[in-house]
Amino acid sequence: MSKIKTLRLEATIHKLLSQAISTEINNSLIKTSVITAIKLSDDKSVAKIYIDCLIPNNIAKTLQAYKDATGVFRHVLSKHLTIRRIPQLVFYYDDSISKGAKIDQILAEIKQEKKENHE
């Protein structure tokens, strides 16, 4: 499969999983998290799904909730995708949003300090 088709498939999987979370999943831990990225392996047998938790204290529980809901997610994918094999879903915590927020906070503090020093 070409790179463009792989990217398109990743986007489709992202869309389908996001829809499944909003319509078919009732777990509050899953509903308070966001899928940030999906990366397919070269042979399309494994999909690495990166999630960010809106409640940072529940990272381990949220990852476990996603693992427990893997069957539901794979079923949704099998209904909508026309690929031969549905990839194995592996969930990872993505802390890039949290790191970005920390960087923004640091930059805001530096900007505030510069303002105070110039006054």
Curated annotation (Swiss-Prot):
Q: Show the InterPro entries listed in the entry.
A: KH_dom-like_a/b (IPR015946), RbfA (IPR000238), RbfA_dom_sf (IPR023799), Ribosome-bd_factorA_CS (IPR020053)
The record's subcellular location field reads:
Cytoplasm
* GO MF annotation, one: ribosomal small subunit binding
User: What are the GO BP annotations of this UniProt entry?
Assistant: maturation of SSU-rRNA
Report keywords, A-Z: Cytoplasm, Ribosome biogenesis
Assembly mode: Monomer. Binds 30S ribosomal subunits, but not 50S ribosomal subunits or 70S ribosomes.
Which HAMAP family does the entry mention? RbfA
Q: Which family does it belong to?
A: Belongs to the RbfA family.
User: What this chain does, per the record?
Assistant: One of several proteins that assist in the late maturation steps of the functional core of the 30S ribosomal subunit. Associates with free 30S ribosomal subunits (but not with 30S subunits that are part of 70S ribosomes or polysomes). Required for efficient processing of 16S rRNA. May interact with the 5'-terminal helix region of 16S rRNA.
Instruction: Supply the name of the protein.
Output: Ribosome-binding factor A
Give the originating organism.
Answer: Mycoplasmoides gallisepticum (strain R(low / passage 15 / clone 2)) (Mycoplasma gallisepticum)
What gene name does this entry carry?
A: rbfA
